[in-house]
Each structure stands twice: as C-alpha cells, then as structure tokens.
Swiss-Prot record:
Gene: rpoC
UniProt source species: Salinibacter ruber (strain DSM 13855 / M31)
Gene Ontology cellular component annotations, sorted alphabetically: DNA-directed RNA polymerase complex
Annotated binding of Zn(2+) 2, by residue: 814, 888, 895, 898
Cofactor note: Binds 1 Mg(2+) ion per subunit. Binds 2 Zn(2+) ions per subunit.
Swiss-Prot/TrEMBL catalytic activity: RNA(n) + a ribonucleoside 5'-triphosphate = RNA(n+1) + diphosphate
Protein name in the entry: DNA-directed RNA polymerase subunit beta'
Pfam families, A to Z: RNA_pol_Rpb1_1, RNA_pol_Rpb1_2, RNA_pol_Rpb1_3, RNA_pol_Rpb1_4, RNA_pol_Rpb1_5
Molecular function via GO: DNA binding; DNA-directed RNA polymerase activity; magnesium ion binding; zinc ion binding
Job description of the protein: DNA-dependent RNA polymerase catalyzes the transcription of DNA into RNA using the four ribonucleoside triphosphates as substrates.
Length: 1448
C-alpha cells in the first residue's frame, strides 16, 4: 500500500488550501492500518499491537526504544526492530503519525448530507429525507432503469426491498451478467455504495449547463431558487475539479483516517483506572463494527443481517465525525454525548479558539496589584520573587559567564538559594528590559502596556495610579499578569510602541486617557479654589517667584485671592490665587497660565494642551508632577466625609407640600372625568420629576454656600473626585421615583413603568420600611443587569473584532475622488456635535475657500488640524466634504488619506496600522462600561419630561412652509389648530440677506400662537400641544356619524372605577373586515372619514355637531419610559446586525401625493402617486398602526407613512448606500452620546464599510457568477474589468472555439484572419456583458462569516458549515487578515509584521558602502522599498551582512 512516507510540515507557507481528501491521500498520510479495537494491555500497560495505540503504526512510547526492548538508545535511530516491527525514533512522532481503517463498505461523510445546504442532495437532486433513507439502508435507489423502464421504473426512484426483488423477478434473467455500462442493465443499489456510484456517474459540466438554462428560463421563483442552490454546489465542484483536487465521490469514504494517539490520549489515574478521550470510544465502535461486518461478509451471512450491520457501521462513522448532529447521539458512561471530531473544533473550548487563537505562554506570572504613587509613569513595581523566576534563564547565563557555576543544573540550584550575587545579577539583567502588564478583561489595546520594572520587596505588583483608567483597574483585589518580551525586536517594540508614557491618548477619541482621578483631582481642586478673607488677600506680585517666597514664609494663605503680573509678558495684572500659581509651576513653559478651578472637566483640556504643544516625554513628567501634587494636597487638606457635611435644605418640605397639592389636583381632575387615567399618571410622574430636580438644585445651592464652598461632600462631587449629583441628592435631598418591578427584565430594552409614589426621605433621614422595600427592587435589577449585560457587551466586541480584523492601512492614497459631506450634528436645532469636532483629523477632498474672503483655508488631500477646523468653523461654511473609509477605494484595507489622523498619536496614520481592530475595540470597550453604569444610582428612575412647546431659539421674522391651520373656538376662545403633518415654521434673519436661522416642525394638532411674518424674540413660545396624547382632529364642520364602531366588537366602554366616567376605547376586532371610523358629514353633503386605530379614545358621540379643528379622538402616547443603556446596548446590536426592527415603519419609495385606497384584511391601502402621475406605488399599512400621513399630503422618498422605526434595508433600497451609512452612523453614535461616551466617527465608519463590502448579483452577464450570489464588491469590479474588450462566441464557424466561449479582441482577429485565408465565414460574436450587482447591507455576524478567509470564518462561528463549504470549493486562504495568521502561527501582517518588511536586509551604512565598493558599484543605495537597485548586494554578501548583524 502506498502509505507511510512521512511529510515534514513546512512552517514557511503563504496560503492554506482545504479540500476533500481522496482515499489515496488518506492512505499516503497513514503509517498503517488499525485492525483491533484494543488500546493497551491491561497487565503490561503497553499498547496492543495493531490496536488504537499500536507502536508499530504510530511510533514508540519511549524515546528511542522499541516495543520489545531489543533496541534502546539513540544510536539505533531509524532502525526498524526485526522482532516487533517498531521504528526506533523520538516519541514525539506519536503526535504526528496517522493511521487508517479500511471500511468493508463505503460510508457517506455526515458533514455532506446533514449540514445545510445538503451537498450530496443538491448534486443528485434528491430530498434530504430520501437521501437518508438510502444511506441508512431503508430503501434501494434506481441508478439506471435499463430494461425495467417498461415497468414504469424511473431513474432516482426509491424502492422498498419487496419492490426491488419484484422488479428483479420480472426483468431478464441475465441482468447480473451484463456489464455496468450496458444501457440494458437495471441497476439499483442501497447505502453508501449507491451514493458513491451515483456521484461517480455525475457529469458536472452537463448538469451545470442544464441548471443554468433552467435558471434563465424558469418562471416559478421557487423552482428557480432551488436550481440556483443546486447550481451553487455543482459550480463549487467544477471550479475545484479543474485540477482534479475534488471529486464528488470523495464525499463517500472507503478509508477513514485515525488521528495520532497523543491527540486522544489514555491517561492513567491513581487507583489503577484510566481516563480516556471520547474519540477512542468512537474509534473502537467503528473498528468493532467494521471487523464484525468483514467476518459476516466472509461467512456469507444473510442480506438482512448484513444490511443491519452496514447501517450500524454508517452510524458509528457518523458519530465519530459529528456526534452532535445525530438525534440519537452516542452517550458515555455518565450519559453525556461523547465529543466527536467536529466538537473538538467548535466553540470556545474548541481547537480554534482555545489553542490556535489564544495560547498560554512561558515567561509570565500574575499577582495582586497595589498602588505605587512613588513610581514614574513608565515604571511598575515588580516583586523580587517574581522577577527571579521570570528572568531565571538570563540569570543562569550570567552566572555561567562569570564562572560562579559550571553547569545549568548547578546554576538552577544556586539561583534557588537566592544569594547576594543573584540579586546583583538580577538588577543588571532587568536594566533596559521592559515587561508587559496585562489586566483581564483586555477590552482595548491599552489593556496591555509596557513598563520598566522596579524591584520591590513585597509580593504585589505596584501600578502607577495614572494608568488605572486605561486598565480600568482598582486596588480592591484586582490581579494582573506580567509577560517578558524576549527577543531584541520584542523589547524594542515594547519600549517604542507600548511604553505606558507613550500611550497617554485614547485611540477612541484622541483625548488624554491618563487623567488624574479621585484623590489627585481632589487635591488639585482644593489647591486651585479661591476663598475670601484669607491672609494676604489682595496682595500684588510681579512674578511667580515672589508668590512662592511669600507663601513659603507664611505671608499669604494658599486660597488667598491675589494679583499677579501675567507671565506671558504682556504686563497685565491677572486675578488669581496662590494655589493656582503653585499649580502653574508644574506646567511646561510653553503653555499659557491656567487660571481656573481644576475639576476633572478642566484638567482634561489642560493635559490635552500639554500633549499637543510638547510631546509624550514632557507630558509624562507633567502628569507625574500633578499626581504628586494632587496626592500631597488632598492629604494635607484633611478633607473627610462626615455625616454633618450632609445638609438637608429647609425648602425641601415646602417643595414636597406643593407637589402633593399638584398631585391632588390631578387626582381630582381625573375623578371628575376631565382627564384619563393615563394622563393623570403622566402628570403625576412629571410633577415628581420636576420636584426632585428642584430639591436637588436647592440642595446643591446650600452645599455650595456651606463652608464657603469647601464642604467636603460638595467638593468631592464638584471636582469629579467621587460621587455624583445624583448620589448626593439621595443623601441629602430625596431618593425620588423608583422603577416598577416587572417580570420581563432585559426584554426589548426599555426600563419600563415608574412607580408614581416617590421615596420622599433621603439616606440621612433614613427610609421607612416600605420605602426601603420599594428601593431594593431597583438596586437588585442593577446588579442582575450588570451580570447579564457584561456577557452581551463582550460578545458584541468579539463580533466587531471579527468583522473588521482584516482592515489595515495598506497604502498612502487610493486616489479616490469621492468623499462624504459632514456638517454639525443637530438634535432639534441644538448642536450635538459641532462641525469642527467632526472634521478634525480628517482629510479634505477638495480645496476649501472662505466664502467671504476667497482665501484658501485647506488644500485638497490635506489633513484638517484643530486650527484649520476652527478656521472653517469661523466662516459660514455649513458642511464640508471629507475623505472617508466609506468611500475609500483601496483593494485591501484602507488608505492613509481616507482614514486621516491616528487618534492615539495625533499624527497621520501610518501604513500597516491595524485600524479595524482599533475600531472594534473603541466601540466595544465602552459597551462593557455602559452596561456597568446602571446600578450605581441604586435603580432610581429618571425620565425626560415630555416636550410640549416650541420656543424660539433666535430673534427674527417668521415664515411658514406647508402649514395648514384652522381656527377652532372652544370655551377658552378661538385658537389656531395645526392640521398639517410636515408643516414647518422658519425663523429668518431680519437683516438684509434673509437667511434661515432655524426651522421647527410643528406637530399635528398643536395650537399655533403666532402669525406668519410676525417678529419674535428669543424665548417666545411659537406653539404648544398636549405632550401625553396624539390627537385625531376633524378638518371640516359637520355632523358625526360612526361606522363599524360596534360595542364589544371594535370598541369596549371603559368605566373608571373611581370616577364613573365612561370612554369608548377602540380594540382590535376579530373580524378583519370591520374598520372603525368616525365620519364627519358637512352641510354640502361631503363625507370626511377618519380611521380609528387601536387604543384610540373617542371624544365625540354619534350625532354631535363638530367644528373644524375639534378633537375626535385621543391616543395616549406611550407611558413614560426610563432611559437606561439597558435599552442602549440591544439598540447598538440591532443596528450593527442590520436587523429589521420589530414593528418597522412602512416607507414611501417615491416622492408623491398620498391617497387612500380600500381596506383589506385589517390593513389600509395607501397609494403614493408621483406629481407627474407617471408612477404609482401602493402600500398596505396595518390598521393597528398610527398613520402619519393624510389624504393629499406630499411625501418624499424615504418618508414614513405610519409610526415605527425605519428598517435599514429600506433606506438602502430607497435612498441608496450613502443614506444608510449615515443612518447607521448617527443612530449608533446617538446611543453612545446619551451615555456621554465620545467615540470618533471613523471607528464606526470602518465597521460600516465592512458591513457594506459585498454586492448581490442581479445580472450575472457573461461572468461565472450566479444570480443571487453575494460577492465582494472589489472582486466583481476586477472580474468585470477583465471582461472589458472581450467577446462571446455566437457561431464558431470552423474555428477551434466553443459557443459561449469568451475570447479577447486579439485572439478573435487572429482566428478570423485564419478563417479568411481558408475562405470560411468569420466567427459571429457579441460583446461580453459585465455582471450587475446591487449593494448589500450585511449584519456583522453575516459579514464575518462571508469573509474571503475560511480560517477566520471557521474560528468565528458555525465551524463545520464553513469548513464543509470551503472543502467542496477547495478554497485557498491567502492569509491576509490578522486572525488567519495568528492561527497559522505567523506574525500578523500589520505594523512591523507587514509583508513588505519581510525580505528587507538590515545592516549598517558602513557595511553597505563596503559592499558597494567591493561590487564596484557607483555608490547609489538600493531603492527604498526593498527592491534591488543598481548596486544591489549579491546573495553571499547578504548572508555576510546578516551574520555580522547577528554578532552585533
């Protein structure tokens, strides 16, 4: 047999291909056949010969020792023992040598008929159920009807055993003697053999042609999609089969491989028992059944017994390959399913994620961390005990060098004695050797940083306080891991790239991350705060030295207000305090004098300025200085937290009284029937929310005044050291409203209802038992949420990393001319993110000029710095076009100019930066933070008070657009009621240029309080409305008539128990034909119909006279929700996964006028007709939804017709890719912004780019794509480019080409001229048609699985599915992303591991000059990109350089 030739595994490869293994392949890799199911001998504990652990097949158990012991020691290496047949070699070969089992009958591989899509089923055109009947020996299948065709037998028909024998009985007797290729012969088989024969007989090319024809001509969508699915599998095999690497019949196996025994070990436990890997059990079952089947075949057992045994063999092999796919999986002794080969790959504990993507490493240790305030920013304290252990090999080398010991063994003993010499050597060894510190969970790249170790006597690692925010570390028992970089390159990278003092900026938003907090901030705040009537107040000083002198001599107090000549040399006097002067001594000289109280908010910009104007080195010194000052001053200030510092304001009682009265009033209105229960509830909640806010204002005012603003609790909160306004409110104000306990925590997000009686006490007064009980619920919800949501955030991060891991910066400029327009982000006219913030650090697409002076502000392809951004913001420019990764046209990854500035360094991003992973980490890291935010405030509910007015933000003149109003008179007099949906009020500048200052959309049903053309002042109220109810108004005067409003069918009468007031509330009716409506009949006989949605409360009775503008029905808006990131994280996930929302809005696809059609099955038809009447689209909107449009309204494409969220796929199909990108970006940013988290847009853009990378083929043209294929946009473009200037043969004439073949212009000319010479007609051709695709939006999970790298996809999710699909395609992974390379054990192709740097030769300049002189070159250096120039060194020279380099 052709097996046993050992293959050494190459480590230096640049791609990995996965394909089906042929039986020959399996035999070639095998070292022998496993014949017996035995494992080891129970007496000698040695492997049984020919068994699953056989030494003859897999190699010796002990190094260089054969089974019988005839040959021992290394000198017999390579000899095969003549007694036991074992090769004398290393025992490590037992980890790499494979065996095999030859099966008596072919067995079908479970992956290819149990995973979806069913590969074998698609190829043969069989249903999965039918296929399984054949495979598991229930039915015969007809492979060739032959003479049985006259009996009505067809190909692929299933036959029971009786039918099979019946047919054999009826056809010719010599059927069995005929050859298989004789068309007369009737062939029907069963089991794996049948499937194998059918796969062998397949003609893939012919099948592909038939299927392509069917796809082109098929009218039924269902049949067409079925044909496409089949075609997909057929094409996969055809592509892979061009070089004979994949044959369909290899999905049926005649030999199965046995993996090396060390990978499925038998481990002796104490007590004489053995623990074994599940695989051994599974293999044993296969071998036992296979041997039994062999024996049965040999003794010619009856067919029934054989068939049963064959089926059992098939099942045994199935279990071995994938036990979890089987319904009746094989279970072990403890009744758990055994882990099969597939399970070894899958999931977190599988091969990919456990051993390939993450490994445990040598030279590492972990210990508890403590604060090290005496350290410098780039240092960490390392316990001596740990250091000795970590640097042991280095110490041993030094000991031997110094001649203290002779051998490594004695050196080890010497080190363990821990003598003086050892400590001396250790001090020397760690000089210039950084260590890496890591804290789990490592949520972003700052979770691992490099430090210079300082040896300490304790057993805990000491951490600099300023790196805590980056690690999110505290000292309540956190542990950290230490790693030692070994090679010179690793040390260099650690020092240059990873040193903590070089990582002060956050990669997420570019702001400083090493910001003092807690004690340090308290000290800085204390030292820079002013106090009246202090010693030396009002003194004037000429310079800083004088102030220092006076303070040191106790002439002036720390908080005294003094005057100082401005150090900038302008000679002006500035009002400041002594403390601020002392703080400014720590600032670098280049910075302006900082004259403000330093709270967390104010310190951050100061650090940012220092960073910008100096650099990392000086910033680190500055940070160390303010750290020391902060700690010292907070200690000497004597700030403490005491009960007497909590003040309860006197006004609290009054405010609560007032609130109680208002609530009482609402209750009365309700009992009189003026308002609904819902309105009452909303009013009560609002009252308490407002009261709570007032109490906390009063409380803070009192604290501010107390001790002249030096109240410790106020100081701690105001400086941002500890505690929040919210927490102090609960200490001294009132705890406020609580969330209502609800069953469905975490479902659908929202925080749910709020209890309407608040907790009036605070923690200083103490809570009553009832109040305490109510408040426990919120606190527990917080803790439960934390636990559940952390996992979600972690999973989100994992998916983000997976989708964007392969995005690196691959070139400087991709040369695109496109960009995206960005302006300031506004929310109801309030600027959320100004223009300058959104364009800083990006690159402009074209030159930008000042519109007034026409001077150039920024050139095309130039980086917009802070200064340029401010210049642009000063002008009247509203938006500017910038380069973006969304429009970047780089083949792989993105280019420098489209990405812009690297936020972590403040410089342009370098080629090789792995921006994808940074983006994923920047988005995922706060996700975890956000989830942990809920419980600090103990679950107290906060809610926004609903908006109910429009106030003018500017003074100006009013203009109306699309605003329809009607005058309506009620008991309070006449009022203007708005009847339009999209009506706008604009405030125009009163000056000459009449530009629009701002515009407001006025909601339907609002009362308009101003007239067109009126002048308004800032703060005037323009309109007001009911914030608790949506209204339905009548637009004409007339009489009310009800239609389909039937008691207990379409409405129920709700009687309020307390008030006796009755209301008609519309309910969803069982009968779909009924559509409740209120009809208003006008005097001239016109009828206006108003549909009543579910939950509408009708305000009029049948026969009432109504006037235009009167309310017909109210719909309560949703009860107030608490806003909490619990809703936020699922929202982020929903957007990134591009999910359709639960209740999506129906969206208009065209601009046009709305009209209503019929009502069918509980839905209203809405028709949109374009203005020119050419196009008409009709939509069905469920009647339970609230309509946002009315008859005659004008809508634009993308406008909603009813309420609900717009599905991103709708935006893509209606408004195009740019709009959906903007939608996703803004929606996700909004969630983070609500939580006060700053993340730069470019990070979201990187992820959105990956979501939109693929297109769906709508017209395959003359390419090999199939309709509905999802392919990479770049791939489609390059294949279409290849088709340019090519032709498709329609009639080949006599040339050697096929119909439908694609040929180039040149070949066509040559063939035609040949035909001309022979006087034959020319070839008839047509131009080749390119493929057409439409952009696709994929969720991040789908996008990750759709990558070109199968290794990355397989290690992400759905491992078996990815591997089966790749195997039949014989896919090659080019190892371009980061993940694939980690799996393959290569350095990643980013940063210093880029492929371009692989072949560079490193040497000194002098060596290069010597070389050139030797070669006789002209002294020119080789060109920079590693390509050989004129004077390029030869290979021998290169080797010399490398040798000398390594000596240095």
């Amino acid at each position: 047999m052709p097996y046993g030739n050992s293959k050494e595994i190459e480590t230096d490869f640049d791609s990995i291909t996965i394909s089906l293994a042929s039986p020959e392949d399996i035999l070639e890799r095998s070292y022998g056949e496993v014949m017996k199911p035995e494992t080891i001998n129970y007496r000698s504990f040695k492997p049984e010969m020919g068994g699953l652990f056989c030494e003859k097949i897999f190699g010796p158990v002990k190094d260089y020792e054969c089974h019988c012991g005839k040959y021992k020691r290394i000198r017999y290496k390579g000899i095969i023992c003549d007694r036991c047949g074992v090769e004398v070699t290393r025992k490590a070969v037992r980890r790499e040598r494979m065996g095999h089992i030859s099966l008596s009958v072919p067995v079908v591989h479970i992956w290819y008929f149990k995973t979806l899509p069913n590969k074998i089923g698609h190829l043969l055109g069989l249903k999965s159920k039918d296929l399984e009947k054949v495979i598991y020996y229930e039915n015969y299948i007809v492979i060739q009807p032959g003479t049985a065709e006259r009996l009505g037998v067809e190909e692929n028909q299933l036959l029971t055993e009786e039918e099979y024998y019946e047919i054999l009985y009826q056809i010719r007797d010599d059927n069995n003697r005929l050859q298989d290729d004789n068309e007369e012969k009737f062939i029907a088989k069963i089991g794996g053999e049948a499937v194998e024969t059918m796969l062998e007989r397949l003609e893939l090319d012919k099948l592909a042609q038939e299927l392509r024809y069917q796809v082109r001509t098929e009218t039924s969508q269902q049949r067409k999609s079925k044909a496409l699915k089949r075609l997909d599998v057929v094409e996969a095999f055809r592509e892979a089969n061009e070089d004979g690497t994949n044959k369909p019949e290899w999905m049926v196996m005649r030999v199965i491989p046995v993996i090396p025994p060390e990978l499925r070990p038998l481990v002796p436990l104490d007590g004489g028992r053995f623990a074994t890997s599940d695989l051994n059990d599974l293999y044993r079952r296969v071998i036992i059944r296979n041997n039994r089947l062999k024996r049965l075949i040999d003794i010619k057992a009856p067919e029934v017994i054989l068939r049963n045994e064959k089926r059992m063999l098939q099942e045994a092999v199935d279990s071995l390959f994938d036990n979890s796919r089987k319904s009746n999986s094989v279970r072990g002794s403890s009744n758990r399913p055994l882990k099969s080969l597939s399970d070894m790959l899958k999931g977190k504990q599988g091969r990919f994620r456990q051993n390939l993507l993450g490994k445990r490493v040598d030279y590492s240790g972990r210990s508890v961390i403590v604060s090290g305030p005496h350290l410098e920013l780039h240092q960490c304290g390392l316990p001596k005990e740990m250091a000795v252990e970590l640097f042991k090999p280095f110490i041993i080398r030094r000991l031997i060098e110094r001649g203290i010991v002779k051998t490594v063994k004695s050196a080890k003993k010497y080190v363990d004695k821990k003598t003086e010499d050892v400590w001396d050597i250790l001090e020397k060894v760690i000089q210039g050797r950084p260590v890496l510190l890591n804290r789990a969970p490592t949520l972003h790249r700052l979770g691992i940083q490099a430090f210079q170790p300082v040896l300490t006597e304790n057993k805990a690692i000491e951490i600099h306080p300023l790196v805590c925010p980056a690690y999110n570390a505290d000292f309540d028992g956190d542990q950290m891991a230490v790693h030692v970089p070994l090679s010179h390159e690793a040390c260099l990278e650690s020092m240059v790239l990873m040193l903590s003092s070089h990582n002060v900026r956050s990669p997420a938003d570019g702001g400083p991350l090493a910001v003092p907090s807690q004690d340090m901030i308290l000290g800085l705040y204390y030292i820079t705060k002013a106090k009246s009537n202090q010693k030396g107040e009002g003194m004037r000083f000429a310079n800083v030295q004088e102030v220092r002198q006076a303070f040191d001599q106790d002439q002036v107090a720390l908080h005294a207000k003094i005057q100082l000549r401005d150090p900038d040399g302008s000679g002006e006097m500035i009002d400041t305090t002594v403390g601020r002067v002392i703080f400014n001594e720590t600032l670098p000289d280049t910075l302006d004098y900082v004259n403000e109280v330093l709270s967390t908010k104010n310190v951050r910009p100061v650090i940012a300025r220092v960073l910008k104007q100096t650099g990392f080195e000086e910033t680190a010194d500055f940070l160390d200085a303010i750290k020391d000052m902060g700690f010292r001053r907070s200690t000497t200030s004597g700030m403490t937290f005491s009960l007497s510092d909590i003040i309860i304001p006197d006004e609290k009682e009054e405010l609560i009284e007032e609130a109680n009265e208002t609530v009482e009033e609402a209750e009365q209105n309700y009992s009189m029937g003026f308002i609904t229960d819902n309105e009452r509830y909303n009013q009560v909640i609002d009252v308490w929310t407002k009261t709570n806010n007032k109490v906390s204002e009063v409380l803070f005012d009192a604290l501010k005044e107390h001790k002249e603003g030096f109240n410790p609790i106020f100081t701690m909160a105001d400086s941002g050291a500890r505690g929040s306004q919210e927490q102090i409110r609960q200490l001294g104000g009132m705890r406020g409203l609580m969330a209502k306990p609800q069953k469905n925590i975490g479902e659908g997000g929202g925080g749910g209802e709020i209890l309407e009686n608040p907790i009036l006490s605070n923690f200083k007064e103490g809570l009553t038992v009832q109040e305490y009980f109510i408040s426990t619920h919120g606190s527990r919800k917080g803790l439960a949420d934390t636990a559940l949501k952390t996992a979600d955030a972690g999973y989100l991060t994992r998916r983000l990393v997976d989708v964007s891991q392969s995005v690196t910066v691959t070139e400087h400029d991709c040369g695109t001319l496109r960009g995206i327009n960005v302006g300031a982000l506004k929310d109801n006219e309030e600027v959320v993110a100004p223009l300058s913030d959104r364009i800083t650090g990006r690159v402009s697409v074209r030159d930008v000029y000042d519109p007034h002076t026409d001077e150039l502000i920024v050139e095309a392809n130039e980086l917009i710095t802070d200064e340029i951004a401010d210049d642009i913001a000063q002008t009247s420019i509203e938006e500017i076009e910038i380069r973006s990764v969304l429009t970047c046209e780089a083949e792989r990854g993105v280019c420098t100019l489209c990405y812009g500035q690297n936020l972590a360094t403040g410089r342009m991003v370098e080629v090789g930066e792995s921006v994808g992973v940074v983006a994923a980490q920047s988005i995922g890291e706060p996700g975890t933070q956000l989830t942990l935010r809920t419980f600090h405030t103990g679950g107290t509910a906060t809610r926004e008070v609903g908006e109910s007015t429009i106030q003018a933000k500017f003074a100006g003149t009013l203009e109306f657009e699309n605003l329809r109003t009607v005058t309506y008179e009620d008991t309070d007099g006449p009022k203007e009621v708005v009847l339009s949906r999209q009506g706008e009020v604009r405030i125009m500048d009163t000056d000459g240029d009449r530009r629009e200052l701002t515009s407001y959309v006025v909601p339907y049903g609002a009362e308009l309080l101003v007239d067109e053309g009126e002048d308004v002042e800032d703060g005037d109220v323009l309109a007001s409305w009911d914030p608790y109810n949506s209204l339905i108004l009548t637009e004409a005067n007339g009489t009310v008539r009800f239609e389909d409003i039937i008691e207990d069918t379409t409405y129920r009468e709700e009687t309020d128990e307390q008030t006796g007031h009755k209301e008609k509330v519309i309910v969803e009716s069982r009968e779909r034909t009924l559509t409740p409506a209120v009809i208003v009949e006008t005097e001239d006989g016109e009828q206006r119909e108003y549909n009543m949605p579910v939950d509408a409360r009708i305000q009029v009775d049948e026969g009432d006279e109504v006037q235009a503008g009167q309310t017909l029905a109210k719909m309560p808006r949703q009860a107030a929700q608490t806003s909490d990131i619990t809703g936020g994280l699922p929202r982020v996930e929903e957007l990134f996964e591009a999910r359709t929302p639960d209740e999506p809005a129906v969206v208009s696809e065209i601009d046009g006028i709305v009209s209503f059609g019929d009502q069918k099955r509980g839905s209203q038809e809405v028709i949109v007709t374009s203005r020119d009447g050419d196009m008409e689209k009709s939509y069905m909107v469920s009647l339970s939804k609230h309509m946002l449009v009315h008859e005659g309204d004008y809508v634009e494409a993308g406008d909603r017709l009813c309420d609900g969220q717009i599905a991103p796929h709708d935006i893509l199909s209606i408004k195009g890719p740019r709009a959906v990108q903007e939608h996703l970006l803004n929606e996700v940013q909004e969630v983070y912004r609500l939580q006060g988290v700053d993340i730069d847009d470019k990070h979201f853009e990187v992820v959105i780019r990956q979501m939109m990378k693929r297109v769906k083929i709508t017209e395959p043209g003359d390419t090999n794509f199939l309709e509905e294929d999802q392919v990479d946009r770049q791939k489609m473009a390059s294949i279409n480019d290849d088709l340019y200037d090519k032709f498709v043969v329609k009639d080949p004439s006599d040339a050697n080409v096929e119909i439908g073949e694609v040929i180039g212009r040149r070949r066509l000319r040559e063939l035609n001229s040949e035909l001309k010479r022979e006087d034959k007609p020319e070839i008839e051709v047509r131009e080749a048609r390119p493929a057409v695709g439409e952009p696709l939006l994929l969720g991040i999970t789908k996008a990750s699985l759709a990558t070109d790298s199968m290794i990355s996809a397989a290690s992400f999710q759905e491992t078996t599915k990815v591997l089966t699909n790749s195997a039949i395609r014989s896919r090659t992974d080019p190892l371009e992303g980061l993940k694939e390379n980690v799996v393959a054990g290569h350095s990643i192709p980013a940063g210093t591991g880029q492929r371009e740097y692989r072949d560079l030769v490193v040497g000194s300049k002098s060596e290069l000059e010597e070389l050139q002189a030797a070669i006789g070159g002209d002294g020119e250096s080789p060109s920079g990109d590693g390509a050989a120039g004129d004077g390029a060194p030869s290979e021998e020279d290169v080797e010399q350089i490398e040798a000398s380099g390594s000596e240095n």
